[in-house]
Design a protein with these regions (language model features):
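Feature activates predominantly on carbohydrate-active enzymes
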Residues: 1-163
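A general structural detector for well-ordered alpha-helical segments in enzyme core domains, enriched
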Residues: 91, 119, 170-174, 208
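Structured, charged N-terminal subsegments at the starts of enzyme catalytic cores
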Residues: 122-130, 160-180, 184-188
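Active-site neighborhood of glycoside hydrolase catalytic domains
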Residues: 180, 185-208
Length: 208
């Protein structure tokens, strides 16, 4: 599926002169009324890296100017609204035109919130691998943990040493949601609160 799509996009780039990043570089596409090809011989080879992707980090420049994204469950700063699905679909198109195959669709994403789930859906619908932000082990950031506790009436700290049962419950809840997608590269590293410090600054250190 991806190979066929990349083949079509390669023809678009090489013979229709459509730049893979045309949506972002302000280069107008010149319409061609006809294209004559006497012979086409394009060969490609496997890339050295199996996963080639982009991480949409602090997606403030992709939202706010386009309605339809919906509210986010992470408050503060520019995290108050999600990127509209029509916008993320164009980002995914660019990713495919660049022959990439993996996307982290947002800085923080809570699949229990439909507007945020739409971002993951837009990626998965095009057959691309999904992955998670480096402070979202198994799809759960400290913010997602807080959302879960608030919504489902749970209490506890984002700390496996202090609250292992609730942490395992939250992880299981979100693993079930992420596992519904065919292609996921799982993040299993454990970070502290947010993105600015390691876990041992928030949790009790162990011998490990």
């Amino acid at each position: 599926y991806l190979g066929t799509m990349w083949g079509i996009y390669t023809l678009s780039e090489k013979f229709l002169d459509v730049d893979p990043c045309y949506l972002f570089n302000d280069l107008a596409i010149v319409k061609k009324n006809a294209v004559e090809l006497s012979e086409v011989d394009i060969a490609d080879k496997p890339d050295g890296f199996g996963f080639r992707g982009v991480f949409i980090n602090d997606e403030d420049l992709l939202q706010g100017w386009k309605d339809g994204g919906g509210a986010r469950l992470v408050g503060g700063g520019y995290y108050y609204v999600t990127v509209a699905k029509t916008v993320i679909e164009k980002v995914v198109e660019t990713v495919l035109r660049l022959k990439l195959n993996l996307v982290i669709p947002a800085t923080f994403i809570d699949l229990d919130n439909p507007p945020e789930k739409d971002l993951a859906d837009a990626v998965a619908e095009r057959g691309i691998y999904l992955s998670q932000h480096h402070c979202e082990p198994l799809g759960v950031s400290s913010f997602t943990f807080e959302n879960y506790c608030k919504k489902y009436g749970k209490t506890g700290r984002f700390s496996y040493s202090e609250c292992p049962e609730i942490m395992e419950n939250v992880w299981s809840f979100y693993v079930d949601k992420w596992a519904k997608y065919d292609n996921v590269v799982w993040q299993i590293g454990l970070r502290g609160l947010g993105d600015d410090r390691p876990i041992w600054q928030d949790d009790v250190p162990t011998e490990e």
